[in-house]
């Protein structure tokens, strides 16, 4: 396995090369030409509801997440009995939803829309947000979005932890 130092060097080289050739770094692990972003991936990052089909697939409806059985044989047996092949689910709390907005939003170059946080006033500590922005000089607020700038994607996990409630 390459060392963390090599990973960082390769990330920076890749970022520079793709940027110089007209690619936009629109989310933590993806680049695209202008207006050619992957809508499928953005659907997940932007926390839009989705239904998935097949063994081990996960679905999400803004309030809960559920997943199907892993085994293809079991999946087929459920369908043969005209039953849903759901193995489990989790109901998402307000805290879970807030943290998912933070976690997913920071992975997008556009960042987190401050308007998306309006329903979570109980979890928002403006002093904490200001402190995190000061701590990480790769974070800023542009057009009412908290976003990662420059090579801040290298630190997104640590930044996310600092903002979690």
Name the predicted role of every residue range.
Residues 145-149:
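Minor-groove-contacting beta-hairpin "wing" of winged helix-turn-helix DNA-binding domains
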Residues 1-121:
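C-terminal scaffold of the Radical SAM
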Residues 134-144:
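A short, conserved structural fragment
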Residues 151-165:
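Short, amphipathic alpha-helical interaction segments positioned at domain boundaries
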Residues 121-135:
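Short amphipathic alpha-helical interaction segments
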Residues 72-75, 102, 129, 133, ...:
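Generic structural signal of hydrophobic/aromatic residues within well-ordered alpha-helices
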Residues 20, 134, 164-165:
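Short, Lys/Arg-enriched, disordered terminal segments
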């Amino acid at each position: 396995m390459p060392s963390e130092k090599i990973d960082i060097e390769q990330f920076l080289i890749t970022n520079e090369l793709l940027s110089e050739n007209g690619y936009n770094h629109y989310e933590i692990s993806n680049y695209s030409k202008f207006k050619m972003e992957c809508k499928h991936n953005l659907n997940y990052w932007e926390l839009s509801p989705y239904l998935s089909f097949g063994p081990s697939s996960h679905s999400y409806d803004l309030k809960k997440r559920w997943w199907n059985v892993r085994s293809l044989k079991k999946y087929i047996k459920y369908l043969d009995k005209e039953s849903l092949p759901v193995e489990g689910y989790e109901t998402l709390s307000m805290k879970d939803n807030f943290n998912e907005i933070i976690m997913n939003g920071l992975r997008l170059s556009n960042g987190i829309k401050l308007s998306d946080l309006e329903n979570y006033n109980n979890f928002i500590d403006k002093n904490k947000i200001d402190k995190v922005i000061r701590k990480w000089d790769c974070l800023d607020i542009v057009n009412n979005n908290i976003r990662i700038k420059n090579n801040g994607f290298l630190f997104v996990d640590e930044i996310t932890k600092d903002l979690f409630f």
